[in-house]
Amino acid sequence: MTQAPTASLTLTPVTSPAGGKDFASSVIYQVYPKSFYSSAGGAYGDLRGVIEKVPYIASLGVDMVWFNPFFASPQNDNGYDISDYYAINPDLGTMEDVEEMIAALAEHGVGVMFDMVLNHVSTEHEWFQRALAGEREYWDYFYIRPGKYAEDGQLREPTNWESKFGGSCWSRFGEYTDEHGTPLFYMHLYDRTQADVNWYNPTVRDELFKVVNFWYEKGVRGFRFDVINVIGKGEELL
């Protein structure tokens, strides 16, 4: 396996989400914004709805609120297909709403935890779109490999690995081929619209750390790293 590059976050260590408790003894309350509460009385929740309910949340005696993703996303996987880590799904609110929500919870002694998806990005993310447009440096942001030809001459995926959502975890990468004319594929361990990023690329790792630090600076004090267990791949197997 390729050795992982050395990199580090710049977060200041914290031992408790709020109230002096450690995480092991803290009460963490999950909020899926789309279904929590609508500030306009509509069918779907929004961040303004969460802000309105901060006193109620605090009254439950919770130490931290864990939010499912509300970043910009085409919503092919309920927000776990992120197209921009620095933007908010406009159906749910704005960056100003997020800042107000974090501040309101902090005033009530409640910390904030985000779901953070670093294993993959939406195929609508700028990185993947630039890769598709032919910017070769962005090819290294993902796992792009040539297919293989079987004895019968049929084109096969690079490996026989399956997606968690069914079928192969490889999809054609546009119309691109390698130097031998073999079609290229990109890896997606989940939906085909969720391209796995190359954790072993130092630039990618630094970009992901920038994301985490950005939200830490906004006041987020906890992160649940979704499917982080699959972020490293055995490159010798690809």
Model-derived features with residue positions:
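A glycine-centered loop/beta-turn motif at secondary-structure junctions
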Residues: K218-G222
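Acidic/aromatic-lined carbohydrate-recognition and catalytic surfaces
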Residues: T2-F209, N213, E217, I228-L238
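Extended, hydrophobic alpha-helical segments in both membrane/secreted and soluble proteins
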Residues: F223-V227
